[in-house]
């Protein structure tokens, strides 16, 4: 548990269904990564205030090798923040994001063999991860990538996610194929 002047924060593993429901209620992007190892909830006074997913992107080994090309690290050496979201009351209050990340770092040390915590920090949305930098994450730069934009919602979708989403939407709508 982590304490500041405002909250005593505790992390607990959540059932996938509960974590996904929270994310779909409060995160702007409803798409979740496929490789999720942990669904974690941030609690204060038994109230769920936020959720984070930890796992890996689509190429876990290539990611760690690209970041640390001269080291002999493997996928188990790191975890990636896939989604992190909080109740609206905790956003922009000046401390909750940093408190959550501090609590998460402590949880990782106590519960995993993870050496590094990594995130792309909503780079697809043009963000550079201010909350992560404020919590002493090291900014390693940016890279360009292609994205699709859903015309109905305005959501940006990575091309790797688009194919699966189109298949799922086609099945839901009872049609053979959906296209952008």
Model-derived features: positions:
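A short, polar/charged loop/turn motif at coil->beta-strand junctions and beta-hairpin connectors
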Residues: 5, 17, 48, 73-75
């Amino acid at each position: 548990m982590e304490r500041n002047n405002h909250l005593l924060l505790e992390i607990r593993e959540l059932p996938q269904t509960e974590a996904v429901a929270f994310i779909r209620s409060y995160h702007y992007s409803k798409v979740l990564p496929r490789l999720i190892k942990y669904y974690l909830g941030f609690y204060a006074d038994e109230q769920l205030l936020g959720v984070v997913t930890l796992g890996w992107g689509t190429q876990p080994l290539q990611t760690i090798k690209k970041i640390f090309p001269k080291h002999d690290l493997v996928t188990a050496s790191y975890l990636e923040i896939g989604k992190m979201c909080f109740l609206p009351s905790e956003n922009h209050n000046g401390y909750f994001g940093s408190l959550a990340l501090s609590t998460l770092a402590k949880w990782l040390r106590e519960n995993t063999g993870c050496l590094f915590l990594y995130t792309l920090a909503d780079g697809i949305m043009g963000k550079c991860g201010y909350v992560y930098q404020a919590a002493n994450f090291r900014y390693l730069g940016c890279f360009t990538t292609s994205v699709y934009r859903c015309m109905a919602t305005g959501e940006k979708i990575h091309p790797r996610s688009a194919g699966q989403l189109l298949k799922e939407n086609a099945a839901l709508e009872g049609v053979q194929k959906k296209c952008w």
